[in-house]
Amino acid sequence: MIRVLLLAVVLALALAAGAWALFMHSADHGHPITVGALEDAVKLPDPKLADERVALASRAGFDALNITTLWAPGQTQPDPGELRILRSVANATQSHNLQLLITVYAARPRYAPTTDTQQDTYAAFMATLARDLPTVDGFAIWNEPNLNTFWLYQYDAAGKDIAAPAYTSLLARTYDALRAVSPKIKVYGGNLAPRGFEDPDSPRPTHSPTQFIRDMGAAYRASGRTKPIMDVFALHPYQTRSAIPPGQPHTGTSLGVGDYDKLVALLGAAFDGTGQPGSKLPIAYTEFGVQSVIPESELGSYTNVDSPLGKDAVPEKTQAEYYEQAFELAACQPNVIAVYIFHLFDEADLNRWQSGPYYADAKPKASLAAIDSAAKKARDGKLADCG
């Protein structure tokens, strides 16, 4: 009997220790997340060169890439030359064991598909792309539809939101088309800019992500649909300046990494109780960037060196710290599955973005080692302190 009791005690202690270890892992370190980059500079027709570029993503600690391709009205299949490039990237990401996400939008905001015919054409294009690229893990439907930079018609003459309902309809059609190709494909919806405002009379009409989510929910409920329209909600949680820490929250209608609770509440109010998950919907931060100061020794690879936008930058050490903070926050946010930084490589024009761990000529920055370490720990669920 004593032996039995001792065995029971030992077993109970072992189980308790295991449970405590699991608790500590969850409470202290968060959950594993995907860490990647949005980077079109890997889109090269030469498979060898594409592979070399993709390998640099692995070197930075990333396990995913997001690339973009363009759709045009009437197009139901990709251009053959573009398809060769996409296949080159898909093969390279597969060989390096990286996930691949493809974002598809149009070159001009007036091309945004708002009619039934246009949306059916876009959905057919996406289905063809998925069949042609069977190793792609997910597809992001459009880019920042809450901005007229990418989705021109935001309001009707009466000042009513017409962008969110049209986008919700596009999501539904494309979701069905992609899932008919493979139920394993992940459909990323939203893909929203972090800021906007409700002013139909503005010369640049936009919507805040807060209002856009609300209007998506209203459109979904009004449609009577009982199936989902997305598997993942994507947000681009840039701060207004690179010097602002990623976790700083917003009091208004903007959304960032520090506004997780507000985002989950919005998604819940929009979709809970319908066929589309809301408060439990996986979330991905698919664009987030922190620009770093370019040293004088590297300026030879850049243009527009006097650009004021190029001055919105922080030291490389701070860039690494802010990326690590973003990974930590995401790992402590239960619904968040991924963070993608923008870019892997700097853009050479200082009037644009210098937010990668590599300079424009693909040389590593001083921030690379710290970003690599943080990314790998985040992927393993060993980075954050969520206590």
What do the predicted segments below correspond to?
Residues 77, 140, 145, 149-150, ...:
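Aromatic-rich peripheral "rim/lid" segments of glycoside hydrolase catalytic domains that contact
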Residues 103, 118-123, 162-309, 313:
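Noncatalytic carbohydrate-binding groove/subsite architecture in carbohydrate-active enzymes
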